[in-house]
């Protein structure tokens, strides 16, 4: 099989490439250049998409004795990931750019080019598993990345390979060291690669500008003025521009955002409880949409826990009734529906959250 391996320069994709070589495949490595000005992406040993990462990926390819290329996807990345990220915050949403990158860049633009060039599959260093065409959680639950892959269609998954999903991260590092790969001890990346400072509010403010609005309490009383709804997300406690706790002495959190009026509503922790979720643009990873109701578990954050729920689908809307409330769920987040399975929880569907309601 002719396999293109997306090599980020990190330990996971490096071991993924090595395993593909060991399996006897015809392997080519590729690193994605995602910025026209690489200095705007994270530099140094921590992060991804930096010039240093490209060099690390090339050195691993040399050790593995495989061809290696750098492909420029900067324009697509800006349009489909960065611009989408900014626009989502303008709408008062909280997007996940890693989800969008997998959907639009790695498994669409990159995979599409790979197939056009005659490759049979795209392999990545994601912690996830595929069995019988079904996407499942990784063996290493702490590193599982099925959440950020749940937007992939059955057609996209048909050409995907996840070589390390059956192995704990600690063993991946040990294997890299045994293979003599210099990235064996390279730190993991955690933050958004195109915000090197880690200051999301400043990044958005520089692109959106000042759009003043009011911070109000549950009764509509104005408490403060802000410079744009893009500086807030549901559940946020710090940086609200208000003095002290609420009248009850308890902390106040962002409980609602109305981008049309520029209003940010704050309230108590209990106002963040959510019992019902609705999602748009559903994707059914097996290719078959379920009707419902389906007993399941739902995850609403990349590193969040699983919550018991009942899901149903009708007319392009995915609806979830929770058995117990989730706290601080925002529009724009991705919700992923899992079916519990001893062989590895199966991803049934995903959707972009459009509604999160209390009782």
Swiss-Prot record:
Keyword tRNA-binding: yes
InterPro entries tied to this protein: MnmA-like (IPR004506), MnmA-like_C (IPR046885), MnmA-like_central (IPR046884), MnmA-like_central_sf (IPR023382), Rossmann-like_a/b/a_fold (IPR014729)
Any Pfam family hit: tRNA_Me_trans
Biological processes, Gene Ontology terms: tRNA wobble position uridine thiolation
Lineage top rank: taxon: Bacteria
GO cellular component, one term: cytoplasm
Protein's name according to its UniProt entry: tRNA-specific 2-thiouridylase MnmA
Species this chain originates from: Mycobacterium sp. (strain KMS)
